[in-house]
Design a protein with these regions (language model features):
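Conserved ABC transporter NBD signature motif
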Residues: 32-42, 47-50
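Conserved ABC ATPase signature
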Residues: 65, 106-110
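Conserved catalytic motifs of ABC-family nucleotide-binding domains
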Residues: 127
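Catalytic Walker B motif of ABC-type/P-loop ATPase nucleotide-binding domains
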Residues: 131-135
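ABC transporter nucleotide-binding domain
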Residues: 149-238
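Short, charged/small-residue-rich alpha-helical element at the C-terminal edge
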Residues: 206-276
Length: 280
């Protein structure tokens, strides 16, 4: 749907990046058909380029010796956009993506987070109907990741741009997407709402703790022991049955030297989905 943010995920080698490359006309399918906005990426590659934007987190599209401002002007010229319109768009994005402090700094001198913001803006200059984001937050520190996610949400709300996102980061998916498509070996194994995925698969937390003194734990309802080496404990908490606070009480907070609480890795979530698919 227009304005939807869709997560397209799967394990390494599942075919995510290949699918995006076929959807954008970079690669062609050996069989079957692809339809993007009523266009065949193979037959209408040039026409489709005016309707879509792409950002590959590990590949640069900006000229590093130019400033972001000059890059944006360059991309505007490529898409035959009148200079006055490009200037207006640059001003809008400069404010929305908070580019003012570095818009006239050569791209090679920007931080990774700053460059990613500029990469996204460069892909939006021609106002695409669909934006493909392939690992947009890869390599970013947590604070910068959160900033980029916030900016993507604001952009989506402001311009109603449909976003097709691939990422191995649960945070990207959980905070940006309302729909999730999971593939493996080029096949769709799940297409569901983020709400349902959260309910079924993101209701567990991993708690890792370093203890002052050895503790002996037993599995209890909602708590599964993953590692128990006395001073180092790793447990899985089912938050539908027990709270993380309950788990910490079992460990005794006064006995904890260090602790880390995290989501189940996305790869594990995907694996559990595959197992359910196999069983069914």
């Amino acid at each position: 749907e227009k304005g939807e943010i869709v997560a397209f995920i799967g394990p390494n080698g599942a075919g995510k990046s290949t699918t995006i490359k076929m959807m954008t006309g970079i690669l062609f399918p050996t069989e079957g058909n692809i339809n993007i906005l009523g266009l065949d990426p193979k037959k209408h590659r040039k026409k489709l380029a005016y309707e879509i934007g792409t950002v590959f987190g590990q590949k640069e599209q900006l000229w590093t010796h130019l400033t972001p401002y000059d890059n944006f002007k360059f991309f505007g010229a490529i898409y035959d956009i009148p200079n006055s319109v490009v200037e207006k768009k640059i001003k809008e994005f400069e404010e929305l993506f908070e580019l003012k402090d570095f818009i006239n700094t050569p791209v090679r001198n920007l931080s990774l987070g700053q460059r990613i913001r500029c990469e996204i803006v460069a892909s939006l200059i021609h106002e695409p109907k669909v934006l493909f984001l392939d690992e947009p937050t890869i390599g970013l520190d947590p604070v910068v990741k959160e900033n980029v996610r916030s900016l993507i949400k604001r952009m989506n709300k402001e311009y109603k741009t449909t976003i097709f996102l691939t990422s191995h980061d649960v945070g990207d998916i959980e905070k940006l997407c309302k729909r999730v498509i999971i593939i493996n070996n080029g096949q769709v194994v799940l297409d569901d709402s983020m709400e349902n995925l959260k309910y079924h698969y993101l209701n567990k937390k991993i708690v890792e703790a370093k203890m002052k003194e050895k503790v002996n734990l037993d599995d209890e309802e909602g708590i599964t022991i993953l590692k128990d080496k006395g001073y180092n404990i790793k447990i899985e908490v089912d938050t539908e049955k027990r709270t993380v606070a309950d788990a910490l009480k079992l460990l005794n907070p006064d006995n904890i030297i260090d602790i880390n609480i995290s989501n189940i890795p996305l790869e594990d979530i995907i694996s559990s989905i595959y197992k359910k698919e196999d069983q069914s």
